[in-house]
């Protein structure tokens, strides 16, 4: 079984400039998602899709493969899944995957054990899609696990599941401050 993670990371963040590479716990924010995917026992390959050369260089430094995103797919009004689709279409030219994960660059609290547990839940329950939610069951966008054909799906499946993963979706300096004050380091 081949499982790939795709981390969408555009350079045009508005509320927190350079959000995806903003330092948190002494590292670029995106590095936490890349490390979690690399440390996963189930994820085979990690891709970052970006139009930003600085993000690409940092992601490559942390071991991710890079998909050079069309700048049109990095505009404010573009839905994240458009970038995921474009990246997966590129990957499909070389090989197919059994599971595709959209992994958020700005959820630095995500860990390999959480990802592995969510993937196992997805597979065990034979879902088409599994989305991360917070403790109030509200989507937090930390990850979205999908069957490869679901990357192209436009409608919600009746075989969608949720996985409780209480992480902060970082968009502001206040979010960064909250995480750093609430969790002295990533391992607390």
How should these model regions be labeled?
Residues 1-17:
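N-terminal nucleotide-binding beta1-loop-alpha1 segment
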Residues 77, 82-86, 95-99, 104-177, ...:
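Conserved core of the sugar-phosphate nucleotidyltransferase
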Residues 29-45:
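A short, N-terminal amphipathic alpha-helix
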Residues 2-7, 30, 46-48:
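Hydrophobic targeting segments
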Residues 2-3, 43, 97, 127:
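Local beta-strand N-terminus motif with an aromatic residue
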